[in-house]
Amino acid sequence: MEQPKYKRVVLKLSGEALAGKQGFGIQPAVIQSIAKQVKEVVELGVEVAIVVGGGNIWRGKTGSEMGMDRATADYMGMLATVMNALALQDSLEQLGVETRVQTSIEMRQVAEPYIRRRAIRHLEKKRVVIFAAGTGNPYFSTDTTAALRAAEIEADVILMAKNNVDGVYSADPNVDANAVKYDELSYLDVIKQGLGVMDSTASSLCMDNNIPLIVFSIMEEGNIKRAVLGENIGTIVRGK
């Protein structure tokens, strides 16, 4: 059996990753593909926690740019992440993968409230835990949620799955043909150069807690497993 490099991981899925090429909403084929990839990793004995974004349904930033109260717009974004989390839970459980959704905002009829010790216990029992509703606070991104939860549950790595790029580039490769892909970066490089991997709050949290980050494409099947096995895919960000 292949030996994974990481024992406990946080998989960060953007809302856009769940929308696939249609760019909006939840695309069933995409979410099923992601669920299959997660199952492969669980079968290696790896403990998997997932943080989902909500940008495929609603973006708080967009709402505030339209003149909406920023906090209200962000709370709407948090609710969007819960919808994504429930859809992903359903896909995983259809494949026989035990899954729990924990939300930072209490909604006991649909999910457990986020309790750190309970989340860790689920992971130890090889259940997948999906963290939804961000940090529960406006003004914080789901990237920051991933960094925070990774620190709390003592994850070995954050796997940042992208649907439009296969790593970190010097510029947007979809726009600039001369963009250079990086194999490895430090968090200070990311912050100083404004590379847009994750926001500065999330980057600082990862740097201060020494949590490595792997940025890779979710669109190629099997990439989550490859990342967990330590294969060189995408870009690794670590250290100062």
UniProtKB/Swiss-Prot annotation:
<keyword id="KW-0665">Pyrimidine biosynthesis</keyword>
<feature type="region of interest" description="Involved in allosteric activation by GTP">
    <location>
        <begin position="20"/>
        <end position="25"/>
    </location>
</feature>
<dbReference type="GO" id="GO:0006225">
    <property type="term" value="P:UDP biosynthetic process"/>
</dbReference>
<comment type="pathway">
    <text>Pyrimidine metabolism; CTP biosynthesis via de novo pathway; UDP from UMP (UMPK route): step 1/1.</text>
</comment>
<keyword id="KW-0547">Nucleotide-binding</keyword>
<dbReference type="InterPro" id="IPR036393">
    <property type="entry name" value="AceGlu_kinase-like_sf"/>
</dbReference>
<feature type="binding site">
    <location>
        <begin position="12"/>
        <end position="15"/>
    </location>
    <ligand>
        <name>ATP</name>
    </ligand>
</feature>
<keyword id="KW-0418">Kinase</keyword>
<dbReference type="GO" id="GO:0005737">
    <property type="term" value="C:cytoplasm"/>
</dbReference>
<dbReference type="InterPro" id="IPR001048">
    <property type="entry name" value="Asp/Glu/Uridylate_kinase"/>
</dbReference>
<keyword id="KW-0067">ATP-binding</keyword>
<comment type="function">
    <text>Catalyzes the reversible phosphorylation of UMP to UDP.</text>
</comment>
<feature type="binding site">
    <location>
        <position position="54"/>
    </location>
    <ligand>
        <name>UMP</name>
    </ligand>
</feature>
<dbReference type="InterPro" id="IPR011817">
    <property type="entry name" value="Uridylate_kinase"/>
</dbReference>
<dbReference type="GO" id="GO:0005524">
    <property type="term" value="F:ATP binding"/>
</dbReference>
<protein>
    <recommendedName>
        <fullName>Uridylate kinase</fullName>
        <ecNumber>2.7.4.22</ecNumber>
    </recommendedName>
</protein>
<feature type="binding site">
    <location>
        <position position="74"/>
    </location>
    <ligand>
        <name>UMP</name>
    </ligand>
</feature>
<feature type="binding site">
    <location>
        <position position="55"/>
    </location>
    <ligand>
        <name>ATP</name>
    </ligand>
</feature>
<feature type="binding site">
    <location>
        <position position="172"/>
    </location>
    <ligand>
        <name>ATP</name>
    </ligand>
</feature>
<feature type="binding site">
    <location>
        <position position="169"/>
    </location>
    <ligand>
        <name>ATP</name>
    </ligand>
</feature>
<dbReference type="InterPro" id="IPR015963">
    <property type="entry name" value="Uridylate_kinase_bac"/>
</dbReference>
<keyword id="KW-0963">Cytoplasm</keyword>
<feature type="binding site">
    <location>
        <position position="59"/>
    </location>
    <ligand>
        <name>ATP</name>
    </ligand>
</feature>
<dbReference type="GO" id="GO:0044210">
    <property type="term" value="P:'de novo' CTP biosynthetic process"/>
</dbReference>
<feature type="binding site">
    <location>
        <begin position="135"/>
        <end position="142"/>
    </location>
    <ligand>
        <name>UMP</name>
    </ligand>
</feature>
<keyword id="KW-0808">Transferase</keyword>
<comment type="subunit">
    <text>Homohexamer.</text>
</comment>
<dbReference type="Pfam" id="PF00696">
    <property type="entry name" value="AA_kinase"/>
</dbReference>
<feature type="binding site">
    <location>
        <position position="163"/>
    </location>
    <ligand>
        <name>ATP</name>
    </ligand>
</feature>
<comment type="similarity">
    <text>Belongs to the UMP kinase family.</text>
</comment>
<keyword id="KW-0021">Allosteric enzyme</keyword>
<dbReference type="GO" id="GO:0033862">
    <property type="term" value="F:UMP kinase activity"/>
</dbReference>
